[in-house]
Amino acid sequence: MSEGTTTGTQEFWEGFYQDRDQIWTGKPNPLLVREAASLDPGTALDLGCGEGADAVWLAGLGWRVTAVDVSSTALRRAAVHAEQAGVGERIVFAEHDLAQSFPDGEFDLVSAQFFHSPVAQDDERTKVLRRAAEAVGIGGVLLIAGHAGWPSFIEDRHDVHFPTMDEVLDGLALGADWSVETKDAVEREITGPEGQVGLRTDTVLRLRRVR
């Protein structure tokens, strides 16, 4: 399904995924695993699902997942991954440019893992995250993981703004209906595409809608 995609955004991410047969490892994001493993399964929305590793992991735990991405190539790979993992019936894949369209419904978990885009402005990201918060049902969780900066081995650092956790929270402006359950920065060792080894700091917010 394709709804309201912006040509520049779609072209960028299609090119990104078509450049190689597989971009990601096929494993779920560690911060998702850390923060969601203890949650009771329900309905989940995976924003920018890519090749589907997070959605497949959630479905394997019993979640019913709506997984969206702007790239049809990524979604095809994600659907294959889900079928191979035996959880295809628990995941609905849908094509969305989230700046233009958003899945209907309320969810027990809305996950935005490393929701960064070189073809989107900070205000667009904030608008999407606000819409993500609106999609969380009472008692549900909004989980946002992001990069705090460049990997240590990157020397040519482009002028990119990595929002801080406080900036994300200020942009969401959630108010008294929400509680902050996790606000954490995690340094991890990573390996770059050319075998470089270094450190990168990621941030994670787990926010619960209490009423």
Regions from the PLM with identified roles:
Residues 1-39, 42-50:
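Conserved class I S-adenosyl-L-methionine
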Residues 118-131:
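A short, conserved alpha-helix within the catalytic core of class I
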Residues 155-177:
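Conserved Class I S-adenosyl-L-methionine
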